[in-house]
């Protein structure tokens, strides 16, 4: 039996929600290990849709233990609001079913404000990153700068007050420089103390809980957010998120050693999408992109922003397979390609007259890439709802097999519609 890490292999929005939902039913423990409430996904259970941003997917299933690891940045007010929203849908999230790592860094209102100040200023100069304005980046900055307020500090008012002083020394200097009013010590203390009693019952030593679960033979699912190409180191920097999104972060962001990670499953869309700014070599800013966006309902769960759409980029996904150590992929949204006469796949790039087989790290080089395409025959029959290989058109099977060859990883799960039952299981990631 293997523990499973789920990661996105593109720029996020690959359809992790459905796959994580399917896996979480089989897991005993579900862990969030990076990101914040900036990346959402929708779970559909018994016809009811649940939209989650911060909470692990295990919370909507009874009998599962859900954990928020130290690699997450934690907005306490968003946490309380999400729990209340689920309560309105009949889901009870309690300290028995959910634990938050005591050493998790907090997102405060001043982080959200700084995020917005910077994006507004960058918009005026044409240099914006396209963040969700939820304070994720500034919160990670404070964590790395060793001035973050962490969940455990809510239990110690004296230490909390000193840490707020230190935090405000930094932030008020920034706010003055950006031409904005300072924040008072009293305002931040009130913001934190007003919610402390609702947060502290959930706080625990997540690393110890995970080690006990591992020793007991529990099945652990590590739930990643965003995608590999948004990784702070391995993504299309600077148009990335502020955390490591690759599979290696599952260990760092939870406190369980890397040897406990078994199967790495890369969620991979059958075409490519991206939200916000940044390079996108296979983008189709034309009727093909419109078709993919409309057929695939490509709008963000959290922001509602329209996603940019393009052809499958085998070069980029192959690189993700390597940087994550993927054991296999879950290929999603194959049905969106139904009815297309021909389908293109990027198999290389042309950069300044030379052919390359990797995504360069340089921002300038990324902007100058010309994709090299291979054109495949499409299929007229539908793949939607297929649950076994024999249900698929021959050309769709060829497309899937060719992707496996190009990226160097097998398809473990093939998703053929948003419905959780509509999938072809080739390999159960939890089985050794």
Curated annotation (Swiss-Prot):
UniProt record, GO biological process: 'de novo' AMP biosynthetic process; IMP metabolic process
Cofactor note as given: Binds 1 Mg(2+) ion per subunit.
Binding residues for IMP: 13-16, 38-41, 132, 146, 226, 241, 305
Annotated GTP binding sites: 12-18, 40-42, 307, 333-335, 415-417
Catalytic activity reported: IMP + L-aspartate + GTP = N(6)-(1,2-dicarboxyethyl)-AMP + GDP + phosphate + 2 H(+)
Keyword list, A-Z: Cytoplasm, GTP-binding, Ligase, Magnesium, Metal-binding, Nucleotide-binding, Purine biosynthesis
Positions of substrate binding: 301-307
Pathway the protein acts in: Purine metabolism; AMP biosynthesis via de novo pathway; AMP from IMP: step 1/2
Classification via Gene3D superfamilies: Adenylosuccinate Synthetase, subunit A, domain 1, Adenylosuccinate Synthetase, subunit A, domain 2, Adenylosuccinate Synthetase, subunit A, domain 3
Subcellular location: Cytoplasm
Binding residues annotated for Mg(2+), in chain numbering: 13, 40
Names of required cofactors: Mg(2+)
Documented EC number(s): 6.3.4.4
Subunit field text: Homodimer.
HAMAP family assigned: Adenylosucc_synth
UniProt-listed NCBIfam families: PRK01117.1 (NF002223), purA (TIGR00184)
Assigned protein family: Belongs to the adenylosuccinate synthetase family.
Entry function: Plays an important role in the de novo pathway of purine nucleotide biosynthesis. Catalyzes the first committed step in the biosynthesis of AMP from IMP.
Protein name, UniProt field: Adenylosuccinate synthetase
